[in-house]
Amino acid sequence: MQTRATTPRSNRTAVVTGATSGLGRAAALALSKEGFHIIAVGRDQIRGQEIVGEIHEAGGSAELVTGDLLTAAGTQAVADEILSRTSAIHLLINNAGGAFNSDERTPDGLERTFALNVLAPHVLTEALLEALSAGEARVVNVVTAVPARASTSIAAIAGDKAKSGMQSYVANKLALLTLTVEDQRRYGERGLSFVALHPGVIPGTRFGSDSPGLMMKIGPVIAKLIGITSTLDEAAQRFVDVGTKSVEGGGFYYEGVLREAPRQARDQAFASELRSTLEALG
C-alpha cells in the first residue's frame, strides 16, 4: 500500500530512502521545512505513515513509497513507483543502509551489506536518472569515515568471501564513496551533482540493529568518549546543507565539512571494476 500526497506546495521534490526512522526520518523532516515535497521511501508502512503525517501536520507536503531495497527487482519497483508520482526530482538522499552481523544472503544471493549499501543506491539512481536530470538534481550518498587501510577488493565487498559486520560496512561505504566520485565524472555534464556525506555518529538510532551485541553496546560509548558523536538535529542540518547549498561535485563531506576523499575512492581502476560489477548485477 502506498500513501499519496495532498497537493504538493513545493515545486522541489526530494526522495529520501530509509526515511521511516533515524537519520532518514530527521532528514525528511528537515528538508520538508525547507519547502521540499518529500517522497519518503521505507519498508515499514506504519512508520512511513507516521512520518508523512508528521510532515503534513507541520504544514509540509509528503507521500510514502513502501518497498524493499535489498534486491535489484525490489529497488526497481520502488523507482517505478516514484516515477509514477513525479517526472522531476531535485534531490535524492540515498540514506538506507546498515551493518549486518550474520552472513545471510539476499534472495539474489548477494551479501546483504553490499546489496543495501552499494547496489541499491546504484540501481535507484540509474533508474531515476531521467527524472534527476529533469530536476538538475543533487544526489547525496550517505557514507562513513573510511580508514586508510579499508579494502578496495570487489571480492571482499560482494564476492563469496565478503565478510559481515563493521569491516564489511566500512568497505562497502568506501565503494559507495567511489561510486559518488565516478557518477560525478560520468553525469556531471547533465547538470547533476553527486556528493558523499558522513553525517556523524548518532547514538540512539537503529543503525547496526543486527550487529554483534557487544559492538552495539560499546560502540556508542567509545564514540562519545572520543568526541565523535552528533545529535539528530545536527545531522539533519548537514543533509540540508549539502542538499541545498553550493558544493563540490564528487566531494566527500565529513560531518558537513569538505574533505579530500580517501585515495582508494579516487582509484580509477577500482571505480571501473566496481561499475562493471554493479551493471552486471543491476
Feature-to-residue mapping (PLM):
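Conserved glycine-rich Rossmann-like NAD(P)H-binding loop of the short-chain dehydrogenase/reductase
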Residues: 34-50
